[in-house]
Amino acid sequence: MRNLKDLLEVSKEDLPSIYCDMDMVLCDFLKGAEKVIGMPFPLANKQGRWEKISGTKDFWANLEWMPGAKKIVQNITRYDAHILSAYSTKDPNSQSGKMKWLSKNTNFKRGNIHLVLRAQKASFAQTDGKPNVLIDDYIKNIKEWENKGGIGIHHTAVPKTLNELKRLGFK
């Protein structure tokens, strides 16, 4: 006869893997960008804003946490959790900077960190035909993920995201 702990472990294994975005889910890209650009990111000249960001030493590594985002990390790291974040082709420092941020602020193993082009995110939607979960603030990523057979959580607020995870069986 199985005990409760064994049953909990089996059900934990049956849960999907979780893939979590970084920018505007875990770290505050827009706040960091506004600090170096001097105005809101969407309003700034496209080329000029990226020149300022790429010219700022450790821009990515020093981004602040989004309010409440540590709760998301605490919750998901009890399961098969991954980081799935797009790097910027407009800033050659974005990949290494994001890795620095993650190593400084989280305990994700290198094998569970996936820094990809945005269009590649949806290729992680399933593993061996089993759907994975994506937590992302960008609705286009969620729709592409779901179209590839994954389960999307459109992140707009920490309590909403945690409730969605709970609804899916993540306690």
Each language-model region and where it sits:
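Charge-dense, intrinsically disordered terminal/linker segments
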Residues: M1-P16, V25-C27, W65-K71, N75, ...
